Amino acid sequence: MKIDASRRGILTGRWRKASNGIRPPWSGDESHFLTHCTRCDACINACENNILQRGAGGYPSVNFKNNECSFCYACAQACPESLFSPRHTRAWDLQFTIGDACLAYQSVECRRCQDSCEPMAIIFRPTLSGIYQPQLNSQLCNGCGACAASCPVSAITAEYLHAH
């Protein structure tokens, strides 16, 4: 009996559209990116901070778990398909959210996200309980992900600000 390997995608969920990941900086419109990306891994291999990995469908996806984006533009320069926007444009429209797992919300003193945030988009304000609570200023945030990388409980997540 011969097995059709192309049909295995139904069992593994690969038939779904390969989206819901954060694409590399300057990758632009997701539908254009997914249509023209050859999944060659050139951008993944060029990433100096190792935040790019193969995501759904083998497309490059950002993972802020261990590091931040330095906006070095190496991923864009490595792409043989010229899919990336010019460096002088905004890298991406990401919105970071501090979730309920945040240690400060659990009455545990922690300010690692603030300490790692170079543009100082995260500040801690006093509360009646005595534990300072984080506030994220999205106007100051550059989307580097340093806060998410430094969070010991992975309470900080990123998503696109606008439909991508």
Swiss-Prot record:
Tagged with keyword 4Fe-4S: yes
Binding site for [4Fe-4S] cluster 3: 141, 144, 147, 151
InterPro entries for the chain: 4Fe4S_Fe-S-bd, 4Fe4S_Fe_S_CS, Fe-S_Ferredoxin, NapF
Main location as per UniProt: cytoplasm
Domain of life: Bacteria
Originating organism: Escherichia coli (strain K12)
SUPFAM superfamilies per record: 4Fe-4S ferredoxins
Binding residues annotated for [4Fe-4S] cluster 1, in chain numbering: 37, 40, 43, 47
Family: Belongs to the NapF family.
Protein function: Could be involved in the maturation of NapA, the catalytic subunit of the periplasmic nitrate reductase, before its export into the periplasm. Is not involved in the electron transfer from menaquinol or ubiquinol to the periplasmic nitrate reductase.
Record HAMAP family: NapF (MF_02201)
Subunit structure: Interacts with the cytoplasmic NapA precursor.
Stored CDD domains: NapF_like
Any one GO molecular function term: 4 iron, 4 sulfur cluster binding
Compartments, record wording: Cytoplasm
Domain 4Fe-4S ferredoxin-type: start-end pairs: 28-57, 58-89, 132-161
One GO biological process term: response to oxidative stress
Gene null: resulting phenotype: Deletion of the gene does not decrease the rate of electron transfer from physiological substrates to the Nap complex, but it has a significant effect on cell energetics.
Cofactor note: Binds 3 [4Fe-4S] cluster.
Name of this protein: Ferredoxin-type protein NapF
Binding site for [4Fe-4S] cluster 2: 69, 72, 75, 79
GO cellular component: cytoplasm
Keyword check for Iron: yes
Lineage: Bacteria, Pseudomonadati, Pseudomonadota, Gammaproteobacteria, Enterobacterales
Keywords of this entry: 4Fe-4S, Cytoplasm, Iron, Iron-sulfur, Metal-binding, Repeat
